[in-house]
Swiss-Prot record:
Catalytic activity annotation: L-lysyl-[protein] + 3 S-adenosyl-L-methionine = N(6),N(6),N(6)-trimethyl-L-lysyl-[protein] + 3 S-adenosyl-L-homocysteine + 3 H(+)
Gene Ontology terms: biological process: methylation
Enzyme nomenclature, EC number: 2.1.1.-
Subcellular location, principal: cytoplasm
Its biological purpose: Methylates ribosomal protein L11.
GO terms for MF: protein-lysine N-methyltransferase activity
GO annotations of cellular component type: cytosol
Alphabetized Pfam families for the sequence: PrmA
Protein name: Ribosomal protein L11 methyltransferase
Family to which the UniProt record says this protein belongs: Belongs to the methyltransferase superfamily. PrmA family.
Positions bound to S-adenosyl-L-methionine: T143, G164, D186, N228
Keyword Methyltransferase: yes
Length: 292
């Protein structure tokens, strides 16, 4: 059946309130969209990452009269509240979503493939990964930068720390590329579960250890450390992240905008000889080799 979509303009502070109001008026589901195409600056753990200007979108049955809902938001936020009402044609939305994702190649050897697609090269290093709740499918420039970096390493027999593991994509890729052991760390229990499920799907669950920050091992001496968690946490957690690598280990950081790269390069330069910065779109990857 067709649908009616109501978009309400919100701020980072009001987006959750608007979402709850739309749900209360019968929207199923509610989604968030960046209203100005600006990047999200990831906050520290416990904070909610949202854009400064956010569109909150509620999907309603076609028979729904949008006028009372619009009037409700005008009463709460004023007559000039930004909104848009759209009629959406009936589609197989699951199929539409699935059609958006295709196998992607990173570097020379590595492919990330949704489970419903044929593997383009059976002889390549193939990671089977479906989009889900946790961050990391290969479509975002930061993930792509890290995957390309991993593809260029000799990981045979190595221990890898994936700090902010999300979907587990980087750690799983490292294992498929020859690493012997991966330690994945994330603040989100959903990410830990997603990483576990994806590792099982790829036959590497026995080689990946997954921890919330409070449970992470303290005596790790990894050969490779990768952290794709954005600038704020990279800055605050720098001593911890750097400490996971043994002398001579390799490190890659991403989730960093070009404007943020110089500060982080200076911070991590205390422990690492830094490589030239890699840039994809407006995002950067910093990498280096640990002193000693």
């Amino acid at each position: 059946m067709p649908w009616i979509q109501i978009r309400i303009n919100a701020t980072a502070k009001t987006a959750d309130k608007v979402s709850n109001m739309l749900l209360g008026r019968g929207a199923q589901p509610v989604t968030f969209m960046d209203a100005q195409d600006v990047p999200v600056y990831e906050p520290l753990p416990g904070e909610t990452p949202l854009w400064g200007e956010t569109e909150v979108m509620g999907l309603f049955d076609a028979e729904t009269d949008p006028a009372p809902t619009i009037a409700f938001f005008q009463q709460i936020f004023g007559e000039d509240v930004g909104y848009k009402v759209e009629q959406l044609e009936d589609k197989d939305w699951v199929r539409e979503w699935m059609d958006h994702f295709h196998p992607m190649q990173f570097g020379e050897r590595l492919w990330i493939c949704p489970s419903w697609r044929d593997v383009p090269n059976p002889d390549a290093v193939n990671v089977m990964l479906d989009p889900g709740l946790a961050f990391g499918t290969g479509t975002h420039p930061t993930t792509a930068l890290c995957l390309q970096w991993l593809d260029g390493l000799d990981l045979a027999g190595k221990t890898v720390v994936d700090f902010g593991c999300g979907s587990g994509i980087l750690g799983i890729a490292a294992l498929k590329l020859g690493a012997a052991r991966v330690i994945g760390i994330d603040i989100d229990p959903q990410a830990i579960q997603a990483s576990h499920d994806n590792a099982e799907r790829n036959g590497v669950a026995g080689q990946i250890e997954l921890y919330l920050p409070a449970d992470q091992p303290q005596d790790v001496e990894a050969d490779v450390v990768v952290a794709n968690i954005l600038a704020g946490p990279l800055r605050e957690l720098a001593p911890l992240i750097a400490g996971h690598g043994k002398p001579g280990s390799l490190m890659a950081l991403s989730g960093v905008l070009e404007s943020q790269a110089p500060e982080l390069e200076t911070i991590y330069g205390q422990w690492f000889d830094m490589d030239p910065t890699a840039v994809k779109e407006e995002w950067c990857r910093l990498s280096g080799r640990k002193h000693g």
